[in-house]
Design a protein with these regions (language model features):
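Conserved Walker A/P-loop ATP-binding site and its immediately adjacent core
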Residues: 1-16, 22, 29, 34, ...
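Glycine-rich, phosphate-binding/catalytic loops in enzymes
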Residues: 14-17, 66-70, 148-154, 199-203
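A broad structural signal for alpha-helix termini and local helix breaks/kinks
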Residues: 17-18, 263
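General small-molecule cofactor/ligand-binding pocket signal
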Residues: 23-25, 286
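Conserved phosphate-coordination/catalytic loops
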Residues: 29-32, 157-164
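Inter-lobe coupling linker of SF2 helicases/translocases
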Residues: 35-82, 93-96, 100-131, 139-141, ...
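Short, Lys/Glu-rich amphipathic helical modules
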Residues: 87-91
Length: 286
């Protein structure tokens, strides 16, 4: 949960489950000198629930073997896309952005063998955790996306470290629970780009996508998205330019049917939220 909500979450959990054995992480528990002891308590204890902040959760390492496997999968994904483009456009065709991404991943893979564990902690896989619930899960939407689409807004190849860490831990839990064991709670699963829908599905139903033959973003985009090009004002405001954006859904009913296999969608109307009336009764153009 977000750091300010740890105490409230613990109180609510005990109110609902008064006989539960819970462990609540404090700021001191994750100080460098005490972190190893606290993580050992998780591994050796018999807890119904362990509550900690997003930043504390990230400090529990995932195994180097799992990181290596993910990097190899990403390198293979980019290599396949590059080969496909060269086959279509000729051997001299180069994709600088994707070649650069591949090189960075290979460097990460090379340095991984020399990377020591954070504080020599027990890894996440060794804790005995069998499920996870992430509050405000939209904080982990910034995953790196590898695509052969060039110069298209709405597709980011850079990702946040905490999102990659969450992805690896979710993959592990999905493997040991046959695709279950992960709960994301958020009011904004999609807020900035269409790619966020793909990211949510990657976290929660990766196996379902693969059963449909969707193993990477470009395959998902070909089924459920469309790139549109429009004339836009330049940043300087001195002229116009054509800009391509990945911003239009296709096959939306089919996509929502798939997503609803893992999503319990609640709209404002369904929740009957008490929203105050607008002053003046209508929006004001500023």
């Amino acid at each position: 949960v977000p750091k300010p909500l740890i105490g409230q979450t613990a109180s609510e959990f005990l109110r609902l489950y008064p006989s539960a054995n819970i462990l609540v992480a404090t700021e001191r528990d994750f100080e460098k000198s005490r972190r190893k002891q606290f993580v050992s308590r998780i591994a050796t204890g018999d807890y119904d629930c362990i509550i900690m902040s997003h930043s504390q959760f990230e400090k529990i390492p995932i195994s180097a073997e799992r990181k290596e496997r993910m990097l190899n999968e990403q390198i293979d994904e980019i290599s396949y896309a590059i080969d496909e483009m060269k086959e279509r456009n000729g051997e001299r065709w180069t994709v600088k952005q994707m070649e650069s991404q591949k090189k960075k991943l290979e460097e990460q893979l090379k340095s991984l063998s020399d990377e020591s564990r954070k504080d020599d902690l027990i890894t996440f896989e060794e804790l005995g955790v069998d499920s996870i619930m992430v509050d405000e899960a939209h904080n982990f939407k910034n995953l790196a996306i590898f695509s052969k689409m060039n110069n298209v807004s709405g597709i980011s190849s850079s990702g946040a470290k905490k999102s990659t860490d969450m992805q690896l831990k979710c993959q592990y839990l999905s493997e040991i629970n046959d695709g279950r064991g992960i709960v994301f709670a958020t009011g904004t699963p999609i807020s900035n780009t269409m790619c966020e829908m793909y990211v949510m599905q990657l976290y929660l139903q990766k196996a379902a996508l693969e059963e449909m033959g969707i193993y990477h973003f470009d395959s998902w985009a070909a089924n459920f998205g469309e790139v549109t090009t429009a004339l836009e004002l330049t940043v300087e405001g001195s002229g116009f330019r054509f800009k391509s954006r990945f911003n239009k859904f296709t096959n939306l009913p089919e996509l929502m049917n798939i997503f609803r296999e893992v999503a319990d969608v609640q709209t404002a109307d369904m929740l009957d939220l008490d929203v105050p009336a607008l002053r003046g009764g209508k929006p004001i153009i500023v």
